[in-house]
């Protein structure tokens, strides 16, 4: 089974989740975000699940703290990759990572990882926290434009899959 790991990035509401859902229509795809486990910790601290500027900064700061303390977010990504490599269910693992230094670290450890930036012109650039502010500070392998309808985006995703993923077993 051919396995592919992509780091995905983009501003909030650029279409990262939609990209993953659409890709899953063409090839079995699992999605994980480097912030997923941090959100669980944040809930223990009283975070209500809202995604506004204040909570985005809180999540970003909490991720920085846990990274500095024991590299927890990266360890959780490694755990996801290990599980994905053993799992016959999925061909593609998409990992959302915002911070350029974390993307570099991941790509340095796992040489086959490729990076994707998803851009949508109608979303505003967020600069209120370190994670979102650094989204465009990386040279991505692929840039996917999401500026049309969902059907148009589906065609973009289909083309990406056809050109970059071999699903032969």
Task: Annotate the PLM regions.
Residues 109, 114-169:
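Small-molecule kinase domains that catalyze NTP-dependent phosphoryl transfer to phosphate-bearing small molecules
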Residues 33-92, 98:
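ATP-dependent small-molecule kinase phosphotransfer cores
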Residues 10-11:
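P-loop (Walker A) phosphate-binding loop of NTP-binding proteins
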Residues 14:
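ATP-binding Walker
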Residues 17:
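Walker A/P-loop
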Residues 6-7:
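Short hydrophobic/aromatic beta-strand immediately N-terminal to the Walker A/P-loop
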Residues 26, 30, 78-135:
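ATP-dependent NMP and nucleoside kinases share a basic, alpha-helical "lid"
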């Amino acid at each position: 089974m051919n396995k592919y790991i992509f780091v995905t990035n983009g501003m909030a509401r650029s279409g990262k989740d939609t990209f993953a859902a659409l890709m899953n229509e063409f090839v079995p795809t699992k999605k994980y975000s480097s912030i997923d486990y941090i959100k669980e910790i944040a809930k223990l601290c009283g975070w209500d699940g809202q995604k506004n500027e204040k909570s985005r900064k809180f999540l970003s700061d909490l991720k920085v703290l846990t990274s500095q303390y024991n590299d927890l977010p990266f360890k959780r990504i490694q755990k996801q990759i290990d599980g994905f490599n053993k799992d016959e269910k999925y061909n593609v693992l998409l990992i959302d990572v915002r911070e350029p230094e974390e993307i570099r670290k991941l790509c340095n450890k796992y040489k086959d990882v490729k990076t994707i930036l998803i851009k949508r012109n109608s979303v505003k650039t967020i600069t209120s926290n370190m994670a979102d502010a650094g989204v465009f500070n990386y040279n991505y392998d692929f840039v996917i434009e999401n500026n049309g309808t969902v059907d148009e985006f589906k065609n973009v995703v289909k083309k990406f899959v056809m050109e970059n993923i071999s699903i032969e077993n």
